[in-house]
């Protein structure tokens, strides 16, 4: 890296006003992005008359999962 770049970064990190301003700018951008994401998510919420996903035709069979989820009995301590 060039020494000019490193000197600029060092000056930035040592100046609390610059760091604070950059942090505030980033926070403002993140807040705007989060607001936009919330608006898009609100638009995508399914309406009762038009659901996003079709209901399943049959309930899923989870019997094979139950056998794997049972834990072995604890070992006896001597």
Curated annotation (Swiss-Prot):
The keyword Kinase does not apply. Residues 39-78 are annotated as: Disordered. The keyword Membrane does not apply. It comes from the Viruses. It holds the Pfam family Herpes_US12. Residues 3-36 are annotated as: Active domain. Keywords: Early protein, Host cytoplasm, Host nucleus, Host-virus interaction, Inhibition of host adaptive immune response by virus, Inhibition of host TAP by virus, Viral immunoevasion. Residues 39-50 have a biased composition (Basic and acidic residues). GO terms for cellular component: host cell cytoplasm; host cell nucleus. InterPro entries: Herpes_ICP47. It is found in: Host cytoplasm; Host nucleus. GO terms for biological process: symbiont-mediated suppression of host antigen processing and presentation. Plays a role in the inhibition of host immune response. Binds specifically to transporters associated with antigen processing (TAP), thereby blocking peptide-binding and translocation by TAP as well as subsequent loading of peptides onto MHC class I molecules. Empty MHC I molecules are retained in the endoplasmic reticulum and ultimately directed to proteasomal degradation. In consequence, infected cells are masked for immune recognition by cytotoxic T-lymphocytes. Interacts with host TAP1 and TAP2; these interactions inhibit the loading of peptides onto MHC class I molecules. The N-terminal active domain blocks peptide binding to and peptide transport by TAP. Belongs to the herpesviridae US12 family. This is ICP47 protein. It comes from Herpes simplex virus type 2 (strain SA8) (Simian agent 8). The gene is US12.
